[in-house]
Design a protein with these regions (language model features):
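Hydrophobic alpha-helical segments of integral membrane proteins
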Residues: 1-5, 54, 58-62, 243-250
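Membrane-embedded alpha-helical segments of integral membrane proteins
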Residues: 1-27
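Membrane-interface helix-boundary motifs at transmembrane edges
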Residues: 27-35
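Hydrophobic membrane-insertion alpha-helices, especially the h-region
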Residues: 37-52
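A structural signal for short, hydrophobic/glycine-enriched beta-strand patches
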Residues: 48-235, 239
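Extracytoplasmic/luminal low-complexity segments enriched in Pro/Gly and acidic/polar residues
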Residues: 225-230, 237-258
Length: 258
């Protein structure tokens, strides 16, 4: 039910709903003015959210909360404080295709691919570290964590250096199941930059100590090209991601998860 409501509140359904309601009022009722207002608001909102100059700024309100991790700076800070180096890297899954006939690298989504590659990069920079890959099976027969581990092995990560957390179904489950592996030790948390604020709040609620390592920040294109100011699917996708995260934050707050 939560996912259905989330999909219905995404920018495209909301805008189309406003336009549709406005047209119905215009065609079949005497409330012409209200119909014009609803249809106009829906059209203007859809147009604005489809422009990357607008939707990009919205998603940056999430992504700007955590900067990319500087590993060398982190190591220096830990050494100067007399603390042991971080040895665990938690990678949050970001979805899979669900098509088992595809090779593992093609089964994972763009978000999962970015997160996993960042986790592997950190793993190589931190000798002796361990990758903790998250993600249950959901409707698929094979868990997300298992597929991520297969891709990681193809990139040279040793199977013995990975731990699979295969019970979580969504973001709210990750802290509960990951806590069994990290206990009270600091760890690197890898997820998409727009997703990091919600993930950090959820892990903090479990009294865990994540060190954020966000990946996939949206950047303003150099030179402000024409397409940056025109409506398009890419802009609408950014608005959808931002809306999903803000709805997720609101839901988590209402449920007392953050």
């Amino acid at each position: 039910m939560k996912k259905i409501v989330g999909e219905m509140l995404a920018p495209l359904p909301v805008c189309l709903g406003l336009i549709g309601a406005g047209l119905l009022l215009l065609w079949f009722t005497r409330k012409k003015f209200l119909g014009k207002v609803l249809a106009s608001v829906g059209f203007v909102l859809l147009t604005l959210l489809s422009i990357q100059a607008v939707s990009g700024r919205i998603i940056q309100t999430l992504e700007s909360q955590y900067k990319p991790l500087d590993v060398s700076h982190l190591q220096t800070r830990l050494e100067s404080a007399g603390e042991p180096p971080v040895s665990q890297i938690v990678v949050l899954a970001g979805g899979i295709s669900g098509d088992p006939t595809l090779p593992p690298p093609l089964q994972i989504s763009k978000a999962s691919r970015e997160r996993l590659l960042e986790g592997i990069r950190l793993y190589r920079l931190l000798p002796g570290s361990q990758l903790i890959l998250t993600g249950g099976s959901g409707l698929q027969s094979v868990s997300e964590a298992t597929i991520l581990s297969r891709v990681a092995q193809s990139h040279g990560v040793k199977k013995s250096d990975m731990v699979l957390e295969v019970q979580s179904r969504d973001t709210k489950d990750h802290p509960r199941f990951v806590s069994a592996f990290v206990k009270d030790q600091p760890f690197l948390l890898v997820t998409s930059a727009y997703h990091m604020p919600r993930a950090m709040k959820l892990f903090a609620k479990y009294n865990l100590f994540p060190i954020p390592s966000p990946i996939g920040h949206w950047r303003v294109p150099e030179g402000f090209p024409l397409w940056y100011w025109l409506p398009g699917a890419s802009g609408l996708r950014l608005a959808e991601l931002a809306t999903h995260e803000y709805l997720g934050l609101a839901w988590a707050w209402l449920q007392g998860q953050i």
